[in-house]
From Swiss-Prot:
It catalyses: a D-alpha-amino acid + A + H2O = a 2-oxocarboxylate + AH2 + NH4(+). FAD binds at residues 3-17. One of its GO terms (cellular component) is plasma membrane. PANTHER family: D-AMINO ACID DEHYDROGENASE, SARCOSINE DEHYDROGENASE-RELATED. This is D-amino acid dehydrogenase. Oxidative deamination of D-amino acids. Its cofactor is FAD. Gene3D superfamilies: D-Amino Acid Oxidase, subunit A, domain 2 (3.30.9.10), FAD/NAD(P)-binding domain (3.50.50.60).
Amino acid sequence: MKVLVLGAGVAGVSSVWYLAEAGHEVTVIDRTEGVAMETSFANAGQLSYGYTTPWAAPGIPTKALKRLFKSHPPLLFRPDGGLYQIEWLWRMLQNCTATRYQINKERMVRISEYSREMFRRFEAQTDMNFEGRKKGTLQIFRQTEEVEAAKQDIAVLERYGVPYRRLKPEECAEFEPALARVTAKIVGGLHLPADATGDCRLFTENLYKLCQEKGVRFYFNQTISRIDHNGLRIKAVETETGRFETDAVVCALGCFSRTVLAQLDLNLPIYPVKGYSLTLPVTNSDGAPVSTVLDESYKVAITRFDNRIRVGGMAELSGYETKLPEKRRETLALVVNDLFPEGGDLSQALSWSGLRPMTPDSTPLIGRTRFENLFLNTGHGTLGWTMSPGSAKLTADIVSGKDTEIRSDDLSLSRYQKL
């Protein structure tokens, strides 16, 4: 079957891999000049299986309001001038109940754990380098109230059987020796040994090469202008330079899934949530992180690749613009310099900001639509890297008409018609 995949980020290219593995004739189009050029370009690098958690949770609205007024707020809200931003926030607030949290958490954990297994199988099948490490996540707390608040998270970890260890300040250095220099700034920690790290862009670029070896055709610099359909099925996707006829379409366009599919009268509940990162060269390996450290106060992650440190995180709701405000860059620099002052060279840091495709319930949109041959793999929010292989395998199985290995019927767009 001819399958056209829209989008060449980690979600799209991972979908391509499994579709090609299933024997389909796959073509990919993307508006940029290569793979992983937008959301997948420079994220924090965390494979956060243990911290797969909905943004929408009981108490979050109050916490979010308090954080808005910090000197270095982890969350920013700027009206984008449209009503949809307010509509999306209202839908998110509706998911901040204990009942909805449990439903959404279960769905997300299901995908993430499946994704962990897909990564394991993939690594057994290929010999790909993406500077991955399996040394866990260390969450550090600077204030005692953060330790108290983490008790709720720990209860969730226990409920879902996620291994963890609570740490005293001095014990944090067991996992991140460089933190021994700054123990006085930490009041506690939480270690999740089953988490991992890796460069999402490097993974996607290398997977792209493997897909090419399987005969997949990639067309870049393709802006979608029209989707030709008969009301039931997609016949072709037209760009400014060509027409791509197909038997099936997979939409993996991240934040732009909503705008592109709007012409089909499909209302995808996705909003772009901006994040930022700095990437700096390691200058002193002993002073750099070993794996990844999540600073709870600033909501910033510091991740070690081979010879680089990636500092990323925070969130801004301001529409589709991708400018990195100087104040946010200062926050990233402050955190890495505070915890790992001898680890890297900030004067050589590369700045980046990108848009995460967030749904109100934090769960991606995977599966069928009302068009018989249009499928979704989008809306992963901050967990696109973590969930990429699991979501992609689910998508490929659904497109192929196969039974999925885990439950997937509650991941499609139709769940929003039931709220």
